[in-house]
UniProtKB/Swiss-Prot annotation:
EC number(s) reported in the record: 4.2.1.108
Top-level lineage group: Bacteria
Protein name per the record: L-ectoine synthase
Record organism: Streptomyces coelicolor (strain ATCC BAA-471 / A3(2) / M145)
GO biological process: ectoine biosynthetic process
Amino acid sequence: MIVRSFKEFEGTDRHVKSASGTWESTRIVLAKEKVGFSVHETILYAGTETSMWYANHIEAVVCTKGDAELTDRETGKTYHITPGTMYLLDGHERHTLKVKEDFHCICVFNPPVTGREDHDENGVYPLLTEEV
């Protein structure tokens, strides 16, 4: 059994800030735990817009605080995301999150991430493996 407090991750390599400056993420469960998924608490900042495409991962997101507009870039459809709303990127959809109010969410990835990932120029997380 693993029990963790978010406070223990402050100032460690499990607390990641994006190169773009639009988000920060606490990587709670990673590939090295060998449970088949990873879990993150992520905050996207108000007034930012982040385009993403998880070509190598499936992601489920649950909003716990904040307000954002999610756009499916393949269909053009938009969704208002507020606390208690979940979205699942089960088709590797290219999407953009336009944040109106700091957006706090819990994210689950499969396959699990290592914690070193950041979005590339296409908004993709590379498929990294755990270093041995």
